[in-house]
Amino acid sequence: MAAEHPEPPKGELQLPPPPPPGHYGAWAAQELQARLAEIGAPIQGSREELVERLQTYTRQTGIVLNRPVLRGEDGDKAAPPPMSAQLSGIPMPPPPMGLPPLQPPPPPPPPPPGLGLGFPMAHPPNLGPPPPLRVGEPVALSEEERLKLAQQQAALLMQQEERAKQAAVLMEQERQQEIAKMGTAVPRPPQDMGQLGVRTPLGPRVAAPVGPVVPTPTVLPMGAPVPRPRGPPPPPGDENREMDDPSVGPKIPQALEKILQLKESRQEEMNSQQEEEEMETDTRSSLGQSASETEEDTVSISKKEKNRKRRNRKKKKKPQRVRAASSESSGDREKDSGRSRGSDPPAADVEIEYVTEEPEIYEPNFIFFKRIFEAFKLTDDVKKEKEKEPEKLDKMESSAVPKKKGFEEEHKDSDDDSSDDEQEKKPEAPKLSKKKLRRMNRFTVAELKQLVARPDVVEMHDVTAQDPKLLVHLKATRNSVPVPRHWCFKRKYLQGKRGIEKPPFELPDFIKRTGIQEMREALQEKEEQKTMKSKMREKVRPKMGKIDIDYQKLHDAFFKWQTKPKLTIHGDLYYEGKEFETRLKEKKPGDLSDELRISLGMPVGPNAHKVPPPWLIAMQRYGPPPSYPNLKIPGLNSPIPESCSFGYHAGGWGKPPVDETGKPLYGDVFGTNAAEFQTKTEEEEIDRTPWGELEPSDEESSEEEEEEESDEDKPDETGFITPADSGLITPGGFSSVPAGMETPELIELRKKKIEEAMDGSETPQLFTVLPEKRTATVGGAMMGSTHIYDMSTVMSRKGPAPELQGVEVALAPEELELDPMAMTQKYEEHVREQQAQVEKEDFSDMVAEHAAKQKQKKRKAQPQDSRGGSKKYKEFKF
């Protein structure tokens, strides 16, 4: 384990030299595996992984491992003796604080004959004991360093003994498993020969194996202590001799010696098997191969493959055991089992399984390339299901066979089966529940925020949804209303308001102003004073109209002074205690509420705005608040209220902020920008005529005046003004203008109703007095009367028919050129014609027709009434 170094000077402790760069990288794979097996680390994997494990061990423990000297096939090479400060590849650390320097352990006793030459803690039998460790008092080390070194040495020795103990226990378990698998009852030797109780310093008695032991391939998880390889144990006589000789000095525990001896023989087998494996390319076709070949195969086989093979072997051996037990005696069964174990199985029972060979490529990038293909390996779930079916059939057959074994044999078989099942279960990964699997496959909040487009809506519990991405998408859509917050609360909804007193309903302010509340209270007081007799009388004959309220006041309350109730915006849900929160939207900067004014000692009322706030003086000194640049503050950047003055007296508005020239700093504090303060500058009339234009002569000006006069005399040709004599005649037969009015000269043909409605100059007439007419006879009318009202005036006020609202009178084009006098005459003629038509019209025929219809209705109704009445009279009985 130790490399050859020059002998240290006497009196100094030899410390391990630091490893050069690439120290472990230059070793061969066999050397790396040998050194990893010595420190108890896994030896499987590629060369880069082995190097990384050794470097990690060196960093964690501070122990520098030297390159091992491997023995060849001839066995003539031997490892050099360990250095003075190193024992079995472990450097001597400095002594811990507070302890004397640790003396090197005494040399171990000579090993029994037959011990391998490569045994690290013993020495070759022909060379004698090694030279004594020369460690004097260290000169360069302080007392604290020596104490620390001693503590580290003690800890390392304890760790070695603990590993030896674990290795011995594992070896015993493997031996028991092999015996159970072979199915042979091994004759138990006497106690003095078969089992030797060896009490290790740190553990109980461990039975040392006796007889040839077939090694089994074991695949242990990473980080577990690797069992030491076993070899042929020493003769029993030597063991007894060592046990019986108590006079020899301090010994290495015998269990540790056996383990290390087996490790050496195991190392030889591994070296020879690795050379053979390089030559082999085909898979092994028999199950009865040697233990060395089986172990070399299982180095690259995973745990699941190994367990599956074990189950297959177990299934094949079970029927053989049952048949042997039923046919032969126990002695014959032992012989048959020995023969069956020695002979090869038949060719029909051979199960060929293809195992891919892992290439040994010493390339640093090969590890990453290998991991990619490991992700695409086929799963063994289908094979497991197929294997479970024959297992069930075998169990059914075995239960049907009559049991002829004794109680001891059954008990032993059940123990073996249970131990096999336990061994099968241990290397498999623990089965996870569905809940744990869901938690493992669940997104984290950070991952979900990276996957979605709107990470601001992601909440803590969104990752537990069935489809988290869809949930976040729905929450991010526009106008989506969130689920109420109380869905995840422990307490029931609105149960936190139990201790809060609910105030009675209050009328809104605009209804209170009508005074209806006081009127109802007064009415209730009166009703309370009434007697029961009067109350019962009111129930029979209730009095209405007890509360008389002005309807105009009630109308104004709802249509003039009504205020909107407090509503929430879309998507704003109610939650417990929302009404008690302060609403910042109702608060405006600059407006002081009554509560704030009372707390500041300011007056409250209609003239409260004339008292300055207490922070005005500081604002005049330091400036307006930067968060509200457009806020108007009286006395700072806007004028103070009327009848107020600047000054520092009670109710004064401080000093206006001005610069050296007297100009306001922050705004119009004096109110000079108002319209009444601005002096109106009289604009001078500017001559817009082009310069140099010739002035018009007197003749041209007189011609223009004549043209204007002629334009005034001409009638309007645009069509907006209609002559008076043809514009006021209504085709319906009723005059729209009463007689006696002066006829206007010009009439607007198109009515401007929209402009008149906007101006509101004409107010509608409230009522119309109808003239009464008296007639001598009623006539044949059903509802006739001697008093008749003249409806002609009302019909004339209603105006023209709706289909003729546009133009009242159609004029021929040649009539538009007539002079105003001719139009007036034409208008009067039309008026006379209409009056004559009204007088000529007679409604007597219409009245007679209506009366005839009414008579017919009466005749039809009379016989029906008589029949109905007589029928009812007959049916009526007391």
Swiss-Prot record:
The residue ranges flagged as biased composition, category Pro residues, are 91-114, 122-133, 224-237
Q: Which residues form a coiled coil?
A: 140-177
Q: Which residues carry this modification: Omega-N-methylarginine?
A: R205, R228, R230, R491, R498
Q: Which residues carry this modification: N6-acetyllysine?
A: K258
Which Pfam families is this protein grouped with?
A: DUF382, PSP, SAP
Q: Where is this region: Required for interaction with PRMT9?
A: 384-533
> Its GO CC terms?
catalytic step 2 spliceosome; nuclear speck; nucleus; spliceosomal complex; U12-type spliceosomal complex; U2-type precatalytic spliceosome; U2-type spliceosomal complex
Regions of compositional bias (Basic and acidic residues) in chain numbering: 1-10, 260-269, 330-342, 383-397, 405-414, 827-852
Cross-linked residues for Glycyl lysine isopeptide (Lys-Gly) (interchain with G-Cter in SUMO2) are K10, K263, K383, K395, K475, K526, K753, K773, K826, K840
- Give a yes or no for keyword Ubl conjugation in this entry: yes
Residue numbers bearing the Phosphothreonine modification:
T281, T294, T763
Post-translational changes noted in the entry: Methylation at Arg-491 by PRMT9 is required for the interaction with SMN1.
Q: Where is this region: Disordered?
A: 1-25, 67-136, 183-356, 383-436, 674-740, 827-878
Q: Does the keyword rRNA-binding apply?
A: no
PTM Phosphoserine: at which residues? S272, S290, S292, S300, S343, S414, S418, S419, S844
Chief localisation class: nucleus
Residues annotated with Symmetric dimethylarginine modification: R491
The protein's job, in short, is:
Component of the 17S U2 SnRNP complex of the spliceosome, a large ribonucleoprotein complex that removes introns from transcribed pre-mRNAs. The 17S U2 SnRNP complex (1) directly participates in early spliceosome assembly and (2) mediates recognition of the intron branch site during pre-mRNA splicing by promoting the selection of the pre-mRNA branch-site adenosine, the nucleophile for the first step of splicing.
Which named protein is this?
Answer: Splicing factor 3B subunit 2
Which organism's genome codes for this protein? Mus musculus (Mouse)
